[in-house]
A protein has these predicted regions:
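Preference for the N-terminal adenyl/adenosyl cofactor-binding alpha/beta module
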Residues: 1-233
Length: 234
């Protein structure tokens, strides 16, 4: 809280959306500067992979699924005298997480072998914690539909070359081709409650619950799956 100044209310979704776009541009410039031979599509894919991993870790930290990871990693790197870049330390952490989660998110990707320039990774990590003195992100308190809405809108933009190296432009065709559309919360609630609750009503034990399988073949940001988990938990 700042004394003597009136705090302005800001939209969490709008602020996060803006910050994610900033992160995307920073990573693109930081990786493109030392990897000029990369094709634009592969570069965009690599940037998205890194950002996906960092967002996952921020959510996992705040929801206490993972211990604080990113800031401690920066502090360790700052104290280290090995000459290793923060980006390389981050890649090592990704390899550890791949052993734990065994998912496509942390599986090896060419981006891990690229050179990073100008402290891009450090800048992006700090942005994902918020702006000191103004706001902080708490992903534990942030509703899943807010994060999902922001993320699906964010995916509807593409990277384009500019004098600064990279800018984001809205790509209507990409949204249409890839089916990137946000499903309103009330629709998610209605469909999940009507499809899943009758099944849950017939469960009489934990063993019955373990037999349930929930499939969303076009999950996007996972709104339906997150709601399904909430309903099962309740």
């Amino acid at each position: 809280e700042r004394v003597g100044k009136k705090l302005q209310k800001i939209s969490v979704g709008a602020t996060l959306y803006k910050d994610l776009n900033t992160c995307r541009e920073i990573l693109t410039r930081g990786l493109a500067a030392f990897n000029k031979e990369l094709d634009k599509d592969l570069l965009a894919e690599g940037v998205q992979k890194i950002l996906d991993r960092l967002i996952f870790l921020r959510v996992a930290e705040d929801r206490e699924i993972e211990p604080p990871t990113l800031i401690p990693l920066i502090r360790e790197w700052e104290k280290s005298k090995t000459g290793e870049h923060l980006y390389q330390s981050m890649v090592k952490k990704f390899r550890e997480l791949d052993e734990i989660y065994n998912s496509n998110l942390f599986s090896p990707h060419p981006v891990e072998n690229w050179e990073e320039y100008s402290g891009a990774t450090e800048k992006v990590v700090k942005i994902l914690y918020g702006k000191p003195g103004y706001y902080e992100y708490d992903f534990k308190a942030m509703p899943a539909d807010v994060l999902g809405n922001v993320y699906e809108n964010y995916l509807g933009y593409k990277l384009a070359e500019s004098q600064k190296g990279a800018t984001l432009t809205k790509d209507v065709r990409k949204r249409k081709e890839q089916g990137i559309y946000y499903t309103p919360t009330f629709i998610v609630d209605y469909i999940v409650n009507n499809a899943l609750k009758p099944v849950l009503d017939n469960c009489r034990s934990v063993a019955d619950l373990k037999k349930i399988k929930v499939l969303d073949p076009a999950c996007g940001s996972g709104s339906f799956l997150i709601k399904a988990l909430e309903v099962i938990y309740e």
